[in-house]
């Protein structure tokens, strides 16, 4: 096996997704140790990143979700320290965390995305409601794990929802509702993995459904995707990742409308690795267990 040296599993951090990061990090740490890797937990909230060098770490497995962890900040710090790290680089991480600018890139390349509008204080909210229709989804551009996602159903409520959310990270986006189904497709080192059909017990796949409930249904392989649709989803996921320069292990979320058309919703350049997480479920279908998945991700650690 490749010699990774002393490995820091970066977990925890400062974002609203800290607890999820700690859960993912603990699972990864145990998996790496089971494979004989000299791995240790490292929480930047407790210990400055500069101590990575001082403590002799040679590789970083980054599982810091959210702000500072997957937005290019920690990636830039690791570049300066010269420590190889897993996942996407600075630019791809920043773009992937910014749903608005990621959508602009996908649109420019002809990839299908749901119609959307960016909201500001002086937006004509009635016009946006008329354009996108109801219901619609409203979300902050730079939060993860569905933090701050609201489904707006009543006419005239868009402005009040915007006021509730505008303190969150990034622009606030209103997005056309696509009925039909929610899916996710991982990409591992440039290769699309089996798509997952997500059937939440809640109204949509929110934070509660992702992390706190055991009645969300995950179908992998998906029972309602044709072979052609599955192939197209993998192709679009790979193209979506390549469009922003994403590397390593990423996950692209999709919506499918009632006519069967697929839409790219967003990309997660640092997907979760908890018991509820989607990437391990998809990898398992291909015969790759959790520990081996962690090793494959670690193999792609890089600087620059």
Curated annotation (Swiss-Prot):
GO terms for cellular component: cytoplasm. It catalyses: 2 D-alanine + ATP = D-alanyl-D-alanine + ADP + phosphate + H(+). Keywords: ATP-binding, Cell shape, Cell wall biogenesis/degradation, Cytoplasm, Ligase, Magnesium, Manganese, Metal-binding, Nucleotide-binding, Peptidoglycan synthesis. Pathway: Cell wall biogenesis; peptidoglycan biosynthesis. Its EC number is 6.3.2.4. Its cofactor is Mg(2+); Mn(2+). One of its GO terms (molecular function) is D-alanine-D-alanine ligase activity. Mg(2+) 2 binds at residues 266, 268. GO terms for biological process: cell wall organization; peptidoglycan biosynthetic process; regulation of cell shape. Cell wall formation. Belongs to the D-alanine--D-alanine ligase family. This is D-alanine--D-alanine ligase. The gene is ddl.
């Amino acid at each position: 096996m490749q010699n990774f040296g002393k490995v820091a599993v970066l977990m925890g951090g400062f974002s609203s997704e800290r607890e999820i990061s700690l859960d993912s990090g603990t699972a990864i740490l145990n998996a790496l140790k089971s494979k004989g890797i000299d791995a240790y937990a490292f929480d930047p909230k407790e210990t400055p990143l500069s101590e990575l060098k001082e403590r002799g770490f040679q590789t970083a497995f980054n599982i810091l979700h959210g702000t500072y962890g997957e937005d290019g900040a920690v990636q830039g710090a690791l570049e300066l320290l010269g420590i190889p790290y897993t996942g996407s680089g600075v630019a791809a991480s920043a773009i992937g965390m910014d749903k608005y600018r990621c959508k602009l890139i996908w649109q420019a390349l002809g990839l299908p995305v749901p119609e959307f509008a960016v909201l500001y204080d002086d937006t004509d909210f009635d016009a946006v409601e008329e354009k996108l229709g109801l219901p619609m989804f409203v979300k902050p551009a730079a939060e993860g794990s569905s933090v701050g996602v609201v489904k707006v159903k009543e006419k005239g409520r868009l402005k009040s929802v915007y006021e509730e959310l505008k303190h969150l990270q990034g622009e606030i986006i209103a997005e056309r509702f696509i009925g039909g189904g929610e899916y996710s497709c991982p990409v591992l080192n440039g290769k699309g993995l089996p798509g997952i059909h997500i059937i939440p017990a809640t109204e949509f796949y929110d934070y509660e459904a992702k992390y706190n409930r055991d009645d969300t249904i995950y179908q992998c392989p998906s029972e309602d995707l044709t072979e052609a649709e599955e192939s197209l989803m993998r192709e679009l996921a790979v193209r979506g990742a390549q469009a922003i320069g994403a590397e390593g292990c990423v996950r692209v979320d999709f919506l499918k409308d009632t006519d069967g058309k697929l839409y790219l919703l967003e990309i997660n350049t640092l997907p979760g690795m908890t018991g509820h997480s989607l990437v391990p479920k998809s990898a398992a279908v291909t015969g790759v267990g959790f520990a081996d998945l962690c090793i494959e991700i670690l193999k792609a650690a890089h600087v620059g």
